Amino acid sequence: MDGVGKSVKLCGGPIGYIYATPKCSVPVDELAILAAKSNDCDDAVLPLVAGLTVESDFVWNVAAVAGTKTTGLGSGGTTLKLVPTHYHPCVFVFYGGDCIKPCTKAPNLTKACDLARERFGYSAYSSPAPTAFETTGQQICEALEMDAQNVMLYLVVTELFKEVIYLCNSFLHFGGSDVVTINNADVRRIPIYPLHLVLPDFNRITNEPFSEKPRALGEGAIMPKAFYNDSLCRLLHGYVLSTTAVGLRVRNIDAIARGAAHLCFDENHEGTLLPADTTFTAFTPAAETTKGQSKMGKREGSDVSGGGYERRTASLMASDATLAIENVISASVYEDPIPDVNKWPIYCNPVGYADRIEALSAYMARVAGLVGAMVFSSNSVIYMTEVGEAGSTEGKETSTTAPSFYRFFQIAAPHLSANPLVDRDGKPVSGENLSKSTSASQSEYSLDYLILACGFCPQLLARFLFYLERCDGGAKACHHDLDTVKFVSSAIDADMPCELCDKTSRIYCAHTTIKRLVYRLPKFGYQMRGAMGLFGAMTNNYCDVNALGSYAQFSTLKRSEGEASRSVMQDTYRLTVERMMKALEKEGLLTCDDPTNMASADANIRDGNSFIRAISTMKNIIESEASQLMRNLTEIREYNIREGLGDANHTLSLAVEPYASGICPVLAFLSRRTIIAVVQDMALSQCSIVMQGQQVEARNFRTQFQAVLKRRVLELQNAGFITSKTITVTLEDQQICVPDPSKSQYDSVISNMEGDLVKVTVEIFRELKVKNKVLFGGGIAGAASEATKSRLAGMVEAYQRPTKTMHVLNGPLGFAVKRYHTLLFPDVKMPNGATPNALWFWILLLRNQLPAGILSKEEEDKSLFIKKFTKSYADMNYINISPTCFGDLAQFYLANTILKYCSHKHFFINTISALVAVSRRPRDPAIVLPWIERPITKGQDVAPAAQQLIASMSDHKDIWCATFSSTNLVGSIMTTKPFVVIGISISKYHGMAGSTKVFQSGNWGNIMGGRNVCSLMSFDRTHRYVMTCPRVGFVAEQPIFSSGIKETTLIDRVRMVLSEESAAPHAAVYMLALKMVGDRVRQMELEDWMEITNDEYISSLIDELNKQVEEAEGGWNADAAMTLAKEMVNMAMSIPTDGPTFDFDACDENLEGHADGQTISETNLKRPNMNVFDLEPIPEKRVPVLSVDML
């Protein structure tokens, strides 16, 4: 939205269209990859994509006709009411969808949704009108004179009016149908208008839409037949209404529809939207734990004033305010266009794939990694189903008695949703029994929890299963012995009863998928306020994700009068990084487009001399750039380099606009649930403020203060987290073409009427800003609670930099000495003739166990150079990550050099990494079960069928699975404007004493679940992750803290092995994998070992070892693999002891020094003014109320 001006022109138009397309022109193969469609229903949800579901010139912003109003006292004239809005990012197929292939073979998903809906107490779908009033798909086809057997019908609807269509308050103007071109085929479309076109001055939902002569009918007007289609209403009830109802905790789903639809017609509504008889889940919130004592709250329903009643009131008011603010967002207009399939690089030019089907399938497997993360994370927004309440001090950061922003908060509690229902007073609803409440302790995952998150929508559930089927079972991250193939085989032979499947469909059953992923699925029970796992997309070109984030940014630098902005930008840290990277690219060490790619360095490093020359050149370039930056900042820009470091943040932004995530119904759903969760978090933070000093139990409290709460939430914009922009909306043409109210809806007569916008200024929610402080504050505020002080003390310990010596293999050049070992030391051989690999060589060398005389003088110099560089880097290093490529090394070295200039000491800085979703062909038989096509009736047939499918994988274009790679160069990933999954906790605070302005900070937090979410993720307080899936180059053009027991996993054990100084760590890791995952090691490839070890060199050695076992006589088996690995270990341990050894320590007697000692040469740095740099440590900045999240 950066490009949106202050004024936008809109054309008046209908509230939606019914598209009628011939089935023969439907690109069914492409739509099958993008659609949400279950196996037991023909209805489907598709993305709104130009060239695929709508025409290429489709206009997504519109001034929609909301009704008419009379003008003048006696003139009898009428004008149109026009409301700015945009089109919903999905379309709804309600007839003829049988031509689209279901996205999963899982049977009976509609039945599963109905059973879960009944279990959790949400209202079931009931027809909003009698069958006699239905406009069937066949009738629509007949009116269009099209063959009903060969037509597919779908709804394209504006965001504001989707609930209006569900409530049958609209009609089809058959006479106004026209023809558009989609995918080189003629497609008919019928405009949809609200009934209020013939009901002037009627500002609410009509409860008698099928009455031929309602009381409000305009003079001379003919009442059209209201549009009601049962399949469409059922689809809207599931995908639109139920998902919102679950997010807002409202069991009466029709109440959601009526509340949202009312706002379409009454733009001045300020009262409540949700009914007073809304029910709530009965549960006891977790009280705070202090001094080791657990103070349990009272039973639900017996809470005194200020307890359960206020929590339920806050829950209802937050839901009501969110529903109203959703209307504000729905009335936004966006410059960013809807997706256009003809501009998707993988669609138009699928380089590297057989065709676009294979390219799309591979990309959707990437997306599966992020969707899986939202399912596997226990703090994902899709599970935020209840409101918790803090104890007496838990929600406060200080001991003051002022109302806390953190008293009420959302919790992930699907395990409580089946509890009995109570009213706002805490009394059980008729027929409910409070004694049947579920314990709030940790609960095992159930398919019903996923169905609840999907809003009981079978189409959405099917699409989620589509993605989960492409996620692995977590064998690398979880220590378990589950063999899904054997489990399914046994279940088929035993004919185990299942409500959803029989023997022939057991391999496809949703329960089978859940069982395969059981070790990755979350457990619930934690009721404390924390970070939420959000989904979004980056559309902004700007973010600060380099090592020092927003340090020395443009807005903080002094600018001389008349000086060009371009000149000032040259003295920013951001441009310094770019300049450094370009200089290194010129030297052939990396490429700026992909700085993790080592191909350029491989071409330039040919021997030891070229290696030393490359490292020395890089060091000189970085120190020169750092010196110049510091000089300019202090002498020209008058920038306080120390305080600036304390203010620096890593920043990125998530777009609010819907179309960036609009390529799939699940992504659109996740984006919407994120907005709902964020708005509710804001609303709940204001509830305790609104309630303070008021009689919350009073009958009219909600009526009086609901509008106050909404206004307070809207005032939180542009205060640190949610950014918005106010624009002026005007009409392209005051004369709007609409159906003549006095004619039949089948008549083609058009009336030109004058239109007026109900509002000319529109508030557009733009972005959610995420921040991560570069420096750890380290201070403990005196007024902080004991719990806060305890947490801060733990953080201080985690950030404290240890004084241990950095190992060469784990140091700054570790990646390089392993990669180029054969070039650096090509002639080094042991006395027994063995050629040591990099690991063995450096372990022996650093232990002074390498036999004397095997290193030449030149080789000694090379090893000493590496050791000196490692020590020099270690002395000034405050980044708790080892570089993995020259791009990492360059950015870390520059950051550490700047930190040295600023005399930074003691604490590690915060670092960030991106986990990038990638796709590959599956090798695990358990993953490919959903793709088996031949009928399975015997358990013994499952394994052979899976193996046969794996053997013929190249013949199946659609079979791909998700995996991840890791990079510390987050900036290069953000240029692809990726989809993002990230943990965020939102802090709220007053700007200064006495101020009523509430500011917020979206703090970069953790995605709960650790390696269950992604095997590359590890818990480290100094390290933050963002999970990404690139969009640019695929579906977008190139633009000009966890509680509980920590399980010991394969990756944990491997990292422990690698931290030990073993001469053959690759063999040790291989043996460990054989012990923990057994025969599955055979299926593991280089990418798998990369995930486990996070070391390319070691991974290549293990992969080679695995191939040696495969090629050995007798083929691969676990015993042979273990024997070969043991031989490797024994050979590495055979150190000659009959002669003198090379004393490596004696080579660097002058290198001893302290960790915080001076290591950067004064002459090299050429500091212009020593007094500028020899300052005291950075002063701590403290505010009266310090949020732990903000540290």
Swiss-Prot record:
GO MF term (any one): single-stranded DNA binding
GO cellular-component term (any): host cell nucleus
InterPro entries the UniProt entry points to: DBP_sf (IPR035989), Viral_ssDBP_head (IPR043031), Viral_ssDNA-bd (IPR000635)
TM ranges: none
Localization in the cell: Host nucleus
Ranges for region Disordered: 288-307
Function in brief: Plays several crucial roles in viral infection. Participates in the opening of the viral DNA origin to initiate replication by interacting with the origin-binding protein. May disrupt loops, hairpins and other secondary structures present on ssDNA to reduce and eliminate pausing of viral DNA polymerase at specific sites during elongation. Promotes viral DNA recombination by performing strand-transfer, characterized by the ability to transfer a DNA strand from a linear duplex to a complementary single-stranded DNA circle. Can also catalyze the renaturation of complementary single strands.
Subunit comment: Homooligomers. Forms double-helical filaments necessary for the formation of replication compartments within the host nucleus. Interacts with the origin-binding protein. Interacts with the helicase primase complex; this interaction stimulates primer synthesis activity of the helicase-primase complex. Interacts with the DNA polymerase. Interacts with the alkaline exonuclease; this interaction increases its nuclease processivity.
Family: Belongs to the herpesviridae major DNA-binding protein family.
Protein name: Major DNA-binding protein
